[in-house]
Swiss-Prot record:
Organism in which the protein naturally occurs: Eremothecium gossypii (strain ATCC 10895 / CBS 109.51 / FGSC 9923 / NRRL Y-1056) (Yeast)
GO cellular component terms given for this protein: cellular bud tip; cytoplasm; nucleus
Pfam families noted in UniProt: She2p (PF11435)
Keyword terms of this UniProt record: Cytoplasm, mRNA transport, Nucleus, RNA-binding, Transport
Complex and partners: Homodimer and homotetramer.
A GO MF term: lipid binding
Official protein name in the record: SWI5-dependent HO expression protein 2
Length: 279
């Protein structure tokens, strides 16, 4: 099945910015502050954990675990091929360290069980600890992606004098796309039910992307960059349920695409070393 049209499923997109009279489609700060306070006073107290939210959250957590597992499987196979090249022993040791870290984080996701006693509790009681953990593992994925596509790539080419044992451009692009999709989900998961995000619930990549966009004079109301699109606040537990279910589907299909691309790269390496054996 194809990945759903995700642009229509991001719950934070501002639908019609053309009606705003303020420059760059922004409301006066005083109005924004009042809207946030009204949301905290009147909407947040009504956002409660439901049985369906717990069920969907477990399904979404499984998608996070699947995402990490795709990397673990891919890295293990990559490491096996690196063993065939003695000059890459230090790079191989670094990847092994990443695998151990990802396995440790994944253990939490695989053993997570939603507490049914949380039903009717405030939604933030579920969102905040999970959101913080999601950010934690995504920061590791971010560092890993940089290592795979920059440092490791350059060192491998330098030491082997060819590009046979590096990630393909298609693989790099898919890894980046998938990472951004998962980041956007976590941003939505955290921000859709609270107008205040601080401390361990802030996402570096989102803040950095916004900062660069502002410095470059990009209209945040018109951009196609998913990380710059605003998160719309939900107004009921039922709305949160509906959007969470859609996100689960988006994550599922995106992770499947990543798995296919990783496998394509592995097949390329397999064919490469099989040919060398024949010689």
């Amino acid at each position: 099945m194809p990945i759903p049209d995700m642009s229509s499923q991001y719950p934070h997109q501002q639908e019609d910015m053309s009606q705003e009279e303020e420059p760059r489609g922004r409301k006066p700060q005083s109005m924004v502050d009042q809207e946030k306070q009204d949301y905290l006073d009147f909407i947040v107290p009504r956002l409660q954990i439901t049985g369906k939210i717990l069920q969907l959250t477990e399904e979404v957590i499984q998608e996070q675990a699947n995402y990490i597992s795709r990397y673990i499987d891919f890295l293990n196979k990559y490491i096996n091929y690196q063993r065939k090249v003695s000059t890459l022993r230090f790079e191989r040791a670094t990847l092994i360290k990443y695998v151990k870290k990802l396995r440790f984080l994944n253990d939490f996701l695989y053993t997570y069980n939603a507490d049914v006693n949380m039903i009717t509790e405030p939604l933030q009681k579920l969102v905040r600890p999970l959101g913080s953990f999601f950010i934690r593992y995504l920061e590791i994925i971010d560092l890993l992606n940089y290592y795979l596509t920059q440092s490791l790539r350059n060192e491998t080419i330098s030491k082997t004098l060819n590009q046979d044992l590096v990630l393909s451009q298609e693989c790099i692009a898919m890894a980046d796309k998938t990472y951004r999709v998962y980041v956007k989900f976590v941003q939505w998961f955290i921000e859709s039910s609270s107008s205040v995000t601080t401390g361990d619930l802030t996402m570096e990549i989102v803040q950095f992307t916004r900062k660069c966009a502002v410095e470059d004079g990009i209209d945040l109301g018109e951009t196609d960059d998913v990380l710059l699109q605003e998160v719309q606040l939900v107004t009921s537990s039922e709305e949160f349920e509906d959007l969470l279910e859609k996100w689960q589907q988006v994550l599922h299909f995106q992770c499947a695409d990543l798995d296919d691309t990783f496998n394509d790269n592995i097949r390329h390496w397999s064919e490469l070393f099989d040919k060398k054996k024949e010689k």
